[in-house]
Amino acid sequence: MWDDDEPDYDPDYDPEEERRRLEATPIFQKAEEIRDLTQRIVETMDKNDPESEIQSSLMLEDSMIIPAKIAGAEAVDDYILKMENAVVIKIHARSLLTRTASLKYLELVAPAYLQLLRDEIEAFRLLFRKWVASFQLDTTKEGDGWGLFVDDE
């Protein structure tokens, strides 16, 4: 009766194997390194300073979203969904990069720490470009109606 009466999952799917595969990808590893480095940088900030609290919260959010969206993109075969995740990743990576300039200007973090993070983000950007280039467009599938990644007409 319903389209979802039959299970649509793969009985051979192994979530542990999928997790190991994801964790072995260079882009996910670099995203995790950025998240860890961001956490360490945030720990050096003055917890009693309201500006530091705001900046650290935003930095942590950006750094946590990046690996989560990589996992989301890796979990699907759909080109449009992969590209949507890629855009979100780019936005948060750039936000994190921009925040390093703010922190330097506000003198909230040692410039050497910020340069380390900037270097890691640049290494991530290079991996990101290769990763996105590996996405396979399925020309037999219709677009999503928005025309952003696939011409719908």
Tell me what each language-model feature is.
Residues M1-E153:
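Amphipathic alpha-helical assembly/interaction segments
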